[in-house]
Curated annotation (Swiss-Prot):
The gene is murI. It is an enzyme of class 5 (isomerase). It catalyses: L-glutamate = D-glutamate. Pathway: Cell wall biogenesis; peptidoglycan biosynthesis. InterPro entries: Asp/Glu/hydantoin_racemase, Asp/Glu_race, Asp/Glu_racemase_AS_2, Glu_race. Provides the (R)-glutamate required for cell wall biosynthesis. One of its GO terms (biological process) is regulation of cell shape. This is Glutamate racemase. Gene3D superfamilies: 3.40.50.1860. GO terms for molecular function: glutamate racemase activity. Belongs to the aspartate/glutamate racemases family.
């Protein structure tokens, strides 16, 4: 038994979609979450800067005595995950491979779409992972740089959000049967995305898929938390306005949480 927390990092609030699924599947595990909303989005930034920011988040989580780090951010996974994984002596998990594997299982026509930040799409990481496992699958990737700002400003239900999603996804409509939400912010726009793509297109939440791998690693390294612990205290940190973060988090997690401000 290992009662240390699992650390989650993201460029902002998007990683809460992963946390929500973890709380549902593994309610006995403690969580420490750091969202770098003050510098979001990461997607348009240079690789060197993304690596620098990611390491700052990692080092912060290490001060919290975490037993595992989850990159709840596709951009950080694409740019820095392998480097961080090689450098640390605790498990480090990204969201890309679980999402890619789920897309392969889902597609019936071999036509998969991937949407993400400009950096995630430019890295081509999803296509590489998907075609490494299933070479015959065709992958269409599309950058959606306007999605993260919508979520970070808590405007997911606005009319402008609907128009932006509709216009952004137009190149993929009617051309795929599976769509990977290659940014953990995007599930917060899921109802609009599903409406635009149509009911026949299966949406893959890379973050939710990641939780299954977290469970496997906890078992493999024998670092599961206390199954009998009912009242688990989580900690949430943001580099931006705690009130905005708390508002979004409370809606998504369906519970009121305390959010602490941190300067990196």
């Amino acid at each position: 038994m290992d009662t240390r927390p699992i650390g989650f990092l993201d460029s902002g609030v998007g990683g809460l979609t992963v946390v929500c699924e973890l709380i549902r599947q593994l309610p006995h595990e403690k969580i420490v979450y750091i969202g770098d909303s003050a510098r979001a989005p990461y997607g348009p930034r240079p690789k060197k800067q993304i690596k620098e920011y990611t390491w700052e988040l990692v080092n912060f989580l290490l001060t919290q005595n975490v037993k595992m780090i989850v990159f709840a951010c596709n951009t950080a996974t694409a740019v820095a995950w392998e480097e961080v994984k090689a450098a640390l002596d605790i498990p480090v998990l990204g969201v890309v491979l679980p999402g890619a594997s789920a897309a392969i299982k889902s597609t019936t026509k071999g036509q998969v779409g991937v949407i993400g930040t400009p950096m995630t799409v430019a890295s081509d990481i999803y296509r590489k992972k998907i075609q490494l496992l299933a070479p015959s699958v065709q992958v269409r990737s599309l950058a959606c740089p306007k999605f993260v700002p919508i979520v970070e400003s808590n405007e997911m239900c606005s009319s402008i959000a609907k128009k932006i999603v509709y216009d952004s996804l137009a190149p993929l409509v009617g051309k795929i049967d599976t769509l990977v939400l290659g940014c953990t912010h995007y599930p917060l726009l899921r109802p609009i995305i599903q409406n635009v793509m149509g009911p026949s297109v299966k949406l893959i939440d890379s973050g939710a898929e990641c939780v299954r791998d977290i469970s496997v690693l906890l078992n493999y390294f024998d670092i599961n938390g206390n199954y009998h612990q009912k009242a688990v205290k989580h900690r949430f940190f943001t580099t931006a306005n705690p009130e905005i973060f708390q508002e979004i988090a409370s809606i998504w997690l369906k519970q009121k949480i305390n959010v602490e401000h941190v300067t990196l």
